[in-house]
Amino acid sequence: MRFIEEFINKGYFHQCTDLDRLTAITKETKIAAYIGFDCTATSLHIGSLMQIMILRLLQQHGHKPIVIIGGGTSKIGDPTWKDEVRKILSKEDIAKNAEGIKKSLSKFIKFGDGKSDAIMLDNAEWLDSFNYLDFLRDFGSYFSVNRMLTMDSVKLRLEREQHLSFLEFNYMLLQAYDFYYLSKHYNCSLQLGGSDQWGNIVMGADLIRKISGKEVFGMTTPLLTTSSGAKMGKTAAGAVWLNEDLLSPYDYYQYWRNCEDADIVRFAKLYSEFTQEELNRFESLAAEDINAAKKQLAYELTKLCHSEQAAKSALETAVKIFEEGQIDENLPTVVLEQEVLQAGISAYELFYEAGLATSKSEARKLIRGNGAKINDRLVADENMIINTNFLLDKKVIKLSAGKKRHILVRV
């Protein structure tokens, strides 16, 4: 199966500037294509997983993935579909975040000097040295303000009478220049991104055509939500991070294990590398087979992101907790100072400190709603004092929020 054919078959396709021509070119030759990522966190989360899998697919078909870390544009902020002005990051924050993002990506694609090896570039390398007057003189006449004002991302903010700074308005010019720069210096002929980036991508392709006459393309993916309408990558407990220092492999496994029934087939297509025969089996699942399919999906996606050993460990932990009622050492763990437990801490504060609630009021609400357990016993009193008497044989306290979120507290 060719790259574009598989791209469409997996459900990645939304829009392309010239699909027929791009299909023909990618059949004849290998291309370089890029996707940009913001530098706003020290890890990517599953909201970026489709883009990452596309980079992986590119590489598997012998094309060269280029990853752009927006070290330059992160200093401004992309207004695309954002309701508010974005916080501007320091150079130190951007450098730290870029390192974490490369760690996320390295789980899925190979970086190096080979023909199809991925490269990662920071657009600060060329944007930081910009002379503003030179930029206006050399490129300003190629951009139409009339057209920019019609873009949905800008129009939405204007219609809501929300602040749109000139700083942010320049973002689309800089992203267009990124594409031009990569086309000129790295022979990049394709920019990929979410459907919300369509306007920015087309501006870049137009800029290249006007200046150099090169044939380049833009292709976008659909914006994804779960079947219930929730945004991919976010849960009530926070983001589903790819790096294990922010989210344990067990919690990553549990996210996929607990996906909605209606999402199983779609997630298997988008995020796994199951064969077509295996996908066909997913599509014809009987009701009694759904849980087994979810376990298989969670296992494969955890193996892909972390390792086979991490997936096995997560599966074994889940079996011990949910099927055998045991405590497993591989559960996520937080450490509490011994002095705190000796003095005693209220139940609601313990759930908050352990990260099972985002606020103390949320922890109280959890307990009042009969959703909290300590050592598998329901917590009836939010002010109940938890001390060293609650430590089990392994010197841990097991906290549970609902049926599916568990954590061990150690001293």
Swiss-Prot record:
Classification via InterPro entries: aa-tRNA-synth_Ic (IPR002305), Rossmann-like_a/b/a_fold (IPR014729), S4_RNA-bd_sf (IPR036986), SYY-like_C (IPR054608), Tyr-tRNA-ligase (IPR002307), Tyr-tRNA-ligase_bac-type (IPR024088), Tyr-tRNA-ligase_bac_1 (IPR024107)
UniProt keyword Cytoplasm present: yes
Signal peptide: none
Motif ('KMSKS' region): 231-235
Ligase is among the record's keywords: yes
Amino-acid positions noted as binding ATP in the UniProt annotation, renumbered to this chain: K234
Gene Ontology CC: cytosol
Gene3D superfamilies assigned: HUPs (3.40.50.620), RNA-binding S4 domain (3.10.290.10), Tyrosyl-Transfer RNA Synthetase (1.10.240.10)
Functional summary from the UniProt entry: Catalyzes the attachment of tyrosine to tRNA(Tyr) in a two-step reaction: tyrosine is first activated by ATP to form Tyr-AMP and then transferred to the acceptor end of tRNA(Tyr).
Identification of the protein by name: Tyrosine--tRNA ligase
Lineage: Bacteria, Pseudomonadati, Pseudomonadota, Alphaproteobacteria, Rickettsiales
Gene behind this protein: tyrS
